[in-house]
């Protein structure tokens, strides 16, 4: 059985390991960077199996933060009432088992409870991440724009899904 719980500072090492295993789909991060992200998140969840082994996590942020992410800044310039998914990362072993959907259901439930109009995120087009794009399409995410980031090294598809 999988347990979903809020991330704590005690999870930082596991979050870094899972995060960095997802490169290049997500940017590499240090423990200090993950702690900084956690401090900005309105919702950060970690999934664990029966023996407490971390399987994945998701981090989401409310609008109005001083967060210099190019993608967050893009959404802030267009939407005022959104919940931004900064990242979702699953271990290789836990992909395809429905865990991403379990985490996203909690994101959408939170967005609805908080009166958000939409959930926003981005998916890499370059380097390509077709599995993530398919996943987001199944969740009703629609294209908003594309954007080169990191000096053109990464190109992302900026997405939004209405909260119903």
Language-model regions, residue ranges each:
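A short beta-loop-alpha structural element at the N-terminal edge
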Residues: 2-15
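Active-site rim helix/loop that mediates acceptor-substrate recognition in acyltransferases
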Residues: 24-50, 59, 65
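Conserved acyl-donor/pantetheine-binding loop and adjacent beta-alpha core of acyl/acetyltransferases
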Residues: 59-87, 151
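C-terminal "cap" of GNAT-fold acetyltransferases
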Residues: 77, 146-164
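A short, internal acetyl-CoA/4′-phosphopantetheine-binding micro-motif in the GNAT/acyltransferase core
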Residues: 86-95, 125
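Conserved acetyl-CoA-binding loop-helix of GNAT-fold acetyltransferases
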Residues: 90, 96-109, 138
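Conserved active-site alpha-helix within GNAT-family acetyltransferase domains
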Residues: 101, 125-145
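Conserved GNAT acetyl-CoA-binding A-motif
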Residues: 111-125
